[in-house]
A protein has these predicted regions:
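A short, N-terminal "cap"/entry segment at the start of jelly-roll beta-barrel domains
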Residues: 1-35, 48
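Short histidine-centered beta-strand/loop micro-motifs
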Residues: 25-26, 46-52, 93-95
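Short, conserved beta-strand element in jelly-roll/cupin
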Residues: 40-42, 51-67
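Short strand-coil-strand connectors
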Residues: 68-72, 97
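Short acidic-glycine-tyrosine-enriched beta hairpin
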Residues: 71-86
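Ligand-binding loop in jelly-roll beta-barrel domains
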Residues: 86-110
């Protein structure tokens, strides 16, 4: 049986310099492209833009920030969820130099 769980705290202790941690993927038994993880945005300027073949969902765990999805830019905050359609460029950043934006992201099975 595959390891069906992951501990974010342990991942962060192993490498606290990373900005993104995969929590669940094919190594945990996810199939057909299902993936889930946490990203931490510490910068107040947008970083790398991304686009994927599948849709990507986000849930803000903590902090405040900005999201740019295609041509739409909006503020995000704790408790907020949003969806990025397949093939659409997106990026996020924090609104604070002292409090990072932490989001859960997931890719659905295709």
């Amino acid at each position: 049986m595959k390891n069906i769980y992951t501990d974010l705290q342990k991942l962060m202790e192993q490498d606290n310099k990373k900005n993104s941690y995969v929590l669940l993927d094919e190594n945990n038994g996810c199939v057909a492209g299902c993936r889930c993880g946490v990203s931490i945005y510490r910068l107040t300027e947008y970083g790398k833009v991304d686009a994927h073949e599948d849709q990507e969902g986000f849930f803000v765990i903590s902090g405040k920030g900005m999201a740019k999805v295609g041509e739409t830019e909006f503020e995000v905050h704790e408790g907020m969820a949003f969806l990025v359609p397949a093939g659409v460029w997106h990026t996020l950043c924090s609104c604070s130099d002292t409090e990072p934006l932490m989001v859960l992201w997931f890719h659905s099975a295709v």
